[in-house]
UniProtKB/Swiss-Prot annotation:
One of its GO terms (biological process) is biotin biosynthetic process. It is an enzyme of class 2 (transferase). This is Putrescine--pyruvate aminotransferase. The lineage of its organism: Bacteria, Pseudomonadati, Pseudomonadota, Gammaproteobacteria, Pseudomonadales. InterPro entries: Aminotrans_3, Aminotrans_3_PPA_site, PyrdxlP-dep_Trfase, PyrdxlP-dep_Trfase_major, PyrdxlP-dep_Trfase_small. Coiled coil: none annotated. PROSITE patterns: AA_TRANSFER_CLASS_3. Disulfide bonds: none annotated. It comes from Pseudomonas aeruginosa (strain ATCC 15692 / DSM 22644 / CIP 104116 / JCM 14847 / LMG 12228 / 1C / PRS 101 / PAO1).
Amino acid sequence: MNSQITNAKTREWQALSRDHHLPPFTDYKQLNEKGARIITKAEGVYIWDSEGNKILDAMAGLWCVNVGYGREELVQAATRQMRELPFYNLFFQTAHPPVVELAKAIADVAPEGMNHVFFTGSGSEANDTVLRMVRHYWATKGQPQKKVVIGRWNGYHGSTVAGVSLGGMKALHEQGDFPIPGIVHIAQPYWYGEGGDMSPDEFGVWAAEQLEKKILEVGEENVAAFIAEPIQGAGGVIVPPDTYWPKIREILAKYDILFIADEVICGFGRTGEWFGSQYYGNAPDLMPIAKGLTSGYIPMGGVVVRDEIVEVLNQGGEFYHGFTYSGHPVAAAVALENIRILREEKIIEKVKAETAPYLQKRWQELADHPLVGEARGVGMVAALELVKNKKTRERFTDKGVGMLCREHCFRNGLIMRAVGDTMIISPPLVIDPSQIDELITLARKCLDQTAAAVLA
């Protein structure tokens, strides 16, 4: 893959980016020195940059493009809706056909008893919404003191003020004095990195027990909810030990608090079930959703809400919350078509029965690499821990090993994401076995090149 810029348009676009664009999660000085990578088109599981390089996108954009790139049906759904009703708001007791039909379509695949949806423009907005909603719920029940939400360290729930607070990423907290009051955190179920001498099962129970300790510390009478991703995504694809979620369910059953399962990444097939909560057998009260809802073709998010919660909200008067683009008709039309594709083409069933088992089998083959301390994954998400010493799990003192590996990936025509020194993937659900083979071959090549630089 050519890493030299040969296209004059690339330089022009890079200059425009440098002079006018402030992209998210970016060191601007570093980017301006290097120049942005310009992505120009996509098809299936591949993207192309402005230099003509073909790249296997093993991150599905940003955990989003479940049905793959280039689905003309989604383009046509947006086109039809733009002609008929390009926009109308949902304020002032109005609705439109796409949004009510979409709410029903989501209810049809959601966990049992979750039949209502509040729509937003993103996953971050969805997590803002759950904070507002759970506090309004408890106030309506006559318990307004139940305001505290318990999250997990290294969890990710978006980057709005509420989202970054609910999440537990300390680097994000340091920019802006977060979390906001009323949000506290407990340990994450990260056995490889934090389990010490405990077995995975022992650590899973220990990590879950931290929830009960925090409830008792804060006082059950003050706790509104516990929020967690079924599998932590941006934190490094943290797959909890088998004992973790059963123990969490046991604790939640003892206390009068709500459970928020953040399904922004796991939702719409990523685990081989429609939702990660179904994969783990959990029964949340609220589920933030986004990303795979539209396969990233257009921004949209939402919160799926349990019927018992809605019954209380119905008694609470006006819910003073919403967004201009809540339930945007074009986004709703695209989401409806996206769900139709997932259902009619049985994409999630194929993930569960065929492609996910094959991906995880091939992924585990990378565990023998001298740079890999652990290979883990579920469904269509997976991670590799890059370590200096496999036996002792000793980390590299230079924190840039993951980013070095990521750069090798780009040069070799593969997108993997680096979370510190953990390499993660989340490919489109439509990836086929031959493309999985290509992914693994490229990943091993990139690991070899990284190891040559850091293990010499």
